[in-house]
């Protein structure tokens, strides 16, 4: 039996700002319980809904030194969906109405969390063989584990894994301040350890000190060794390539299931989608005030509205995208210029464009169920979960071939009758427009082929089961 402690800054259902929460909250329940005891540790934010906080059981508390301060550490426990979750409590750091704030506050907050998490292990009654860290917020854990805690008998032989969900976010701050906060001596702040370009870099520390480094798709693991995707750490990724691998994320097939989903008006499955799926489209058209027409080609886009997601390409050809025979439904928030751009087109083509500048889990499910195609022209995408949800709901993804999108969407080949979606290679607006028009042509003029693409997409398995098997192999190799 291998004991694994997965440490992250967020996990569903307690707190979620991005895909990391889905991984930390969903993945652990899919491991083989006879061979792996996987538990999760996150901060006990005061913004976690009360319905969860009131069920947490107090375990213990103690004090740790953080630089020149002594800080309280409370430890709470809760079992959820058969998985044990631990929560590190300290209202000074984890108070407030959102999990993250300004970077200078987060730098200290997650230095505290890293040290507190390791300090809590002996009092949990659970000794992990492997500590699985996620993103820069836990980047100091492998550093502290090797340099500060390894002398203790309890900690000897514990291995660490660092998973990178998005290399863009690295936890970078002033070297002198980080020395003060972490209490680590000068020799750790050299260019082969925590220092990068005259600053301290938490993620770099994690990558250097961890026994294994993973990222969330095989293609992204290769891409981050190149300067374009490497975010100034490509040299380090090449140096660590012998321990670097990629494992694609999954989605929770219980949560995202068109057959049982209570958030959508009409349930359907891989057999009945031809007769039932269009009813969701008409219901959404009615709700959003679009022209009601079950045959109209509807494209969905659920995303953070930022450059990374390829929205500059969309902005460049938006007039052509919103042709007479298309409806375009957008959901998300982000950069003001993109929010306003979509609002403008909603006003200009109000019968065929709907801009919903907010985020709602309910609305996202309705969009996945109603649309014919789903657009994801990302500049880079470590894994991406939206295309997996689209495939699950029989909505055909149109993606750029990068990172996880390339690994999970097989491009349609009309000659071989293969493929689960449409893709384009170069980051170019007209190339994207060309592939959208190609998809539209197949939809309108080759409906049987289109339905076969939907059918193949709904048959693919991107549940957490397949990811969990690969993580089990990784854990066994340590």
Swiss-Prot record:
Protein's UniProt keywords contain Secreted: no
UniProt keyword terms in alphabetical order: Glycogen biosynthesis, Glycosyltransferase, Transferase
Molecular-function GO term, any one: alpha-1,4-glucan glucosyltransferase (ADP-glucose donor) activity
A biological process from GO: glycogen biosynthetic process
Pathway this chain belongs to: Glycan biosynthesis; glycogen biosynthesis
Its EC number(s): 2.4.1.21
Catalytic activity reported: [(1->4)-alpha-D-glucosyl](n) + ADP-alpha-D-glucose = [(1->4)-alpha-D-glucosyl](n+1) + ADP + H(+)
Enzyme class, UniProt record, top EC level: transferase
Superkingdom of source: Bacteria
Residues at which ADP-alpha-D-glucose binds: 16
Gene3D superfamilies linked: Glycogen Phosphorylase B
PANTHER family cross-referenced by the UniProt entry: ALPHA AMYLASE DOMAIN-CONTAINING PROTEIN, GRANULE-BOUND STARCH SYNTHASE 1, CHLOROPLASTIC/AMYLOPLASTIC
Family: Belongs to the glycosyltransferase 1 family. Bacterial/plant glycogen synthase subfamily.
Function, as annotated: Synthesizes alpha-1,4-glucan chains using ADP-glucose.
UniProt cross-references to NCBIfam families, sorted A to Z: glgA, PRK00654.1-1
Name of the protein described by the UniProt record: Glycogen synthase
Phylogenetic classification of the source organism: Bacteria, Bacillati, Bacillota, Clostridia, Lachnospirales
The gene coding this protein: glgA
């Amino acid at each position: 039996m291998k004991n694994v402690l997965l440490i992250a800054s967020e996990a569903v259902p307690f707190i979620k700002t991005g895909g990391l929460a889905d991984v930390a909250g969903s993945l652990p329940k899919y491991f083989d319980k006879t061979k792996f005891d996987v538990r999760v540790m996150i901060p006990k934010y005061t913004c976690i809904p009360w319905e969860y906080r009131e069920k947490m059981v107090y375990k213990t508390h103690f004090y740790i030194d953080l630089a020149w301060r002594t800080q309280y550490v409370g430890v709470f426990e809760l079992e959820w969906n058969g998985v044990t979750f631990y929560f590190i409590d300290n209202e000074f750091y984890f108070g407030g109405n959102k999990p993250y704030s300004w970077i200078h506050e987060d730098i200290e907050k997650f230095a505290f969390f890293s040290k507190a998490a390791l300090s809590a292990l002996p009092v949990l009654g659970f000794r992990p063989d492997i500590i699985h860290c996620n993103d820069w917020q836990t980047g100091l854990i492998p550093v502290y584990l090797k340099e500060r805690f390894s002398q203790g008998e309890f900690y000897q032989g514990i291995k660490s894994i660092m998973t990178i969900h998005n290399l863009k976010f690295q936890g970078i701050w002033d070297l002198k301040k980080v020395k003060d906060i972490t209490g680590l001596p000068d020799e750790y702040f050299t260019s082969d350890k925590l220092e990068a370009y005259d600053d301290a870099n938490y993620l770099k520390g994690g990558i250097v000190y961890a026994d294994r480094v993973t990222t969330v798709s095989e293609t992204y693991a290769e891409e981050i060794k190149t300067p374009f995707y490497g975010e100034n750490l490509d040299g380090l990724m090449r140096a660590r390539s012998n321990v670097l691998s990629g494992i694609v994320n999954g989605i929770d097939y219980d949560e995202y299931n068109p057959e049982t989903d209570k958030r959508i008006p009409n349930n359907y499955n891989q057999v009945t989608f031809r007769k039932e799926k269009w009813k969701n489209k008409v219901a959404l058209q009615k709700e959003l005030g679009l022209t009601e027409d079950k045959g109209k080609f509807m494209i969905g886009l659920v995303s953070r509205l930022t450059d990374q997601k390829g929205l500059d390409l969309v902005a460049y050809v938006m007039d052509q995208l919103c042709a007479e025979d298309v409806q375009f439904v957008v959901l998300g928030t982000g950069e003001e210029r993109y929010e306003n751009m979509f609002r403008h087109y909603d006003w200009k083509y109000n019968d065929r464009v709907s801009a919903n500048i907010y985020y709602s889990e309910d609305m996202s499910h309705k969009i996945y169920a109603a649309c014919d195609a789903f657009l994801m022209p990302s500049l880079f995408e470590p894994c991406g979960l939206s295309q997996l949800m689209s495939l699950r709901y029989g909505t055909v993804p149109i993606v750029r071939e990068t990172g996880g999108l390339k690994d999970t969407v097989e491009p349609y080949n009309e000659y071989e009758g293969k493929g689960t979606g449409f893709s384009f290679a170069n980051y170019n607006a007209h190339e994207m427009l060309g592939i959208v028009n190609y998809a539209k042509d197949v939809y309108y003029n080759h409906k049987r082929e289109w339905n076969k693409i939907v059918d193949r997409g709904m048959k693919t398995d991107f549940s957490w089961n397949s990811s969990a098997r690969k993580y089990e192999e990784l854990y066994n190799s340590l």
